[in-house]
């Protein structure tokens, strides 16, 4: 199962960027209150709706890219997490066509230290922010990740059909062209 991930935050950043759904532009949401940095490129899976009402989150094991970069990926596992708003799962991915990542097929193929580093980040990155918390977290394998992607796609399709969700991609007329007022 391949899918597109839109990167919002490159690996190594403390700045938390988000796609502004109204304009399609990248907005600085905040700088993390803790001295932690994102352990992988972080973004969302296109055409999904997670349990928290946002597109399903994704981490991509890749050299740092840039906000707005679109990467074709495949899931290798998922970090099941609950925060102050409820379920906030993070799908762990690799680029689909990267031969350097071909050996990573499921969560147990990821080095234990790398899993612990990602887990530690998500357990502490909200610690100093008032009203924010991480309640519980655990790793699950590729099949669970793919099942959650399918469920998130269904939630997205149902919400769009009901008219209760707007596509997080570039909004129509988000970048209107400047009208020529020279009279020429």
Spans of features found by a protein language model:
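Hydrophobic N-terminal alpha-helices or hydrophobic patches in metabolic proteins across all domains
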Residues: 1-184
């Amino acid at each position: 199962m391949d899918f597109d991930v839109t990167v919002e935050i490159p690996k190594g950043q403390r700045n938390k960027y988000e796609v502004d759904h109204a304009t399609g532009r990248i907005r600085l949401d905040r700088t993390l209150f803790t001295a932690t940095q994102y352990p992988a490129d972080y973004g969302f899976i296109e055409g999904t709706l997670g349990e928290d009402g946002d597109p399903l989150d994704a981490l991509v094991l890749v050299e740092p890219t840039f906000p707005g970069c679109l990467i074709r990926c495949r899931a290798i596992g998922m970090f099941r997490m609950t925060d102050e708003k409820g379920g906030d799962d993070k799908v762990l991915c690799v680029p689909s066509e990267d031969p350097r990542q071909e050996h990573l097929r499921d969560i147990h193929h990821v080095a234990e230290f790398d899993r612990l580093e990602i887990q530690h980040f998500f357990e502490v990155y909200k610690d100093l922010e008032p009203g924010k918390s991480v309640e519980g977290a655990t790793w699950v394998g590729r099949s669970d990740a793919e099942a959650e992607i399918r469920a998130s796609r269904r939630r997205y399709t149902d919400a769009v059909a009901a008219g209760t969700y707007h596509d997080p991609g570039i909004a129509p007329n988000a970048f209107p062209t400047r009208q020529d007022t020279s009279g020429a």
